[in-house]
Amino acid sequence: MDTYNIFTIPVVIFFITNGLVHLYYALRLRQKFPEEHNFPKSLAVVALWFNAGIMYPFFYSTGDGNVAFFQLVSMLFICIITPALIVLVLAYQYMKIRENPEIKKRRCLATFFKQYEEKSGGVTALKTHTFKTDLHRKTLHLFPAAVILILWLFAVHIWDGMWNSSAIWGVSGQDFGVFLIITAGYSGIFVFACLDYIRLSCIYDRGNVFWILPDNVLNLLGKAIKHKEFYEFIGPTILVLAFVPPFILAHGAFGVFAAAMLIATIGDGVASLTGLKFGKHSFPKDSHKTIEGYVAGAIGSFAIAFLALFFLESKQ
């Protein structure tokens, strides 16, 4: 079976198209908010979208015909089911707002900024966000990594190991794990992308639909986003897109990928939270980074890498 086939090409096109949409948003954001928007960072995000699309067909270790069914299911979830569910949620929000127009006034961008500022006490020139905000951020960043680990362990040790389902479906536990991870991951990436499309619709003079975001999503954003990220693409999207290259490069060595993934989430979180809570010695002196944070991050990263390689790599 060819790598690029009727089941994989739609996902490739879907992600490259989203990359082009992100490029358009980046150009408009640079034009409208030149001081606030980080344009080089946005270009890197666009490149990650293109990379995720182009590399999608290479996830599976075999081109066996048995894999085709799982590629079909994955494509349906990523390109059809997930977008359809998002449309249904937004349609429900729209109907809800039509019945109660006061909701639209309450969900305006100005109100969001005002509530954010009220919750962001203690932010200084060297302290760009509070400990509580960073805790919410790191928890949100950890969520994709936790989902990936759970799906992989289920596929390899339960679906294949305990149930011996590979004998029925003709697909190894590792390939089934890849199917679960990329289906959930690529679908999740698009969900966060739609959140960005709506959140950053302020680039349009008449097409700002920020008000259609549900209240619980706005509350989560208010808790987890940095002030300087208001006019940038949201972090979880970038994080999951950045997982694509190491996941492919570490194919057959999931422990290596897991170590890198957990260092990027838990290790970075330990460094950041320790620095915010206990940091007293900035390095460099004009930076919000601290020596205490560096040390905690290094120790945490080493411990995480050791545990990931010991429990995940040696057991395969």
Predicted features along the sequence, with ranges:
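Interhelical loop and helix-boundary elements at the membrane-water interface
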Residues: M1-I16, L23-Q316
